[in-house]
Amino acid sequence: KFTEFKNELIVTDYLVTGESFALVKCKKCQLLFTNPRPEPINISKYYESEDYISHQNKGTNLTNIIYKLVRRITLKKKCKLISKYQESGSIMDFGCGTGDFLLTCKKAGWQVTGVEVDEGARSLAAKKIESENIFASTENIKKNQKFDVITAWHVLEHVHELKPTIKLLKKRLKKDGTMIIAVPNYLSYDSNYYKEFWAGY
C-alpha cells in the first residue's frame, strides 16, 4: 500500500529568500514536512542572515531582545528537565548554536560538548564556553566517545536526513543514557491560530 500525503499549508521564508514552500502531512504517521525539500547542497543559504537568531549573539532589534529574555527562562527549564534523569556527567548538545545552553550546563558542573554546522555560531560557542569541544559534525568527535545525555533542542526539523541522524546520535549515547529531543508542535494553539504565519514554520 502506498503512503498517502495531504497538502497542509503554503508558507513563506520572510527572513532570507522570500521563497514559498508547501507543507505536506503523511496521513499514516502525521509527520509534517517540506515538499519538495531543498537540496542538501543548497540548504545553508536559508540560514545565511544576520537576523537568524540562533546563530547570533547580537541584540539589535526588539525581536532579538525578546528572544534572549525568553531564552534565559527556557535554559533554566531545560537544565531542570535534564536533572530529572541525570544529575551530572557528560552532555552533548546537537545543534548547539552559539552555546548558551552548553554554558549553562558547564556552570552546573557538566562536561560539555557541542555540535554545530554553522561556522560562525560554532566559533561563538567555543569562545563562550572556553572550550575546543565544539564540532561541525559528530564524526569529528573521538570515535569511541559516548555521552550520558544528548540533547537536540529544535534541531531535527532542520535536518535533511532524519533517520540516519537519529541513528548517529543513538550511537553516541551511553547504554543507560538519556536523549532529549524538542521539535515544534504543529498541533499547538499558536500554530492553529497563526497558521502559515506561525514562527515554527
Give the label of every model feature segment.
Residues 1-60:
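N-terminal juxtadomain amphipathic helix
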Residues 40-85, 104:
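Conserved class I S-adenosyl-L-methionine
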Residues 20, 198-201:
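Acceptor-substrate binding/catalytic loop of class I
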Residues 20, 65, 69, 156:
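Charge-dense, low-complexity intrinsically disordered segments
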Residues 46-51, 189-197:
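Short, flexible, mixed-charge acidic loops at enzyme active sites
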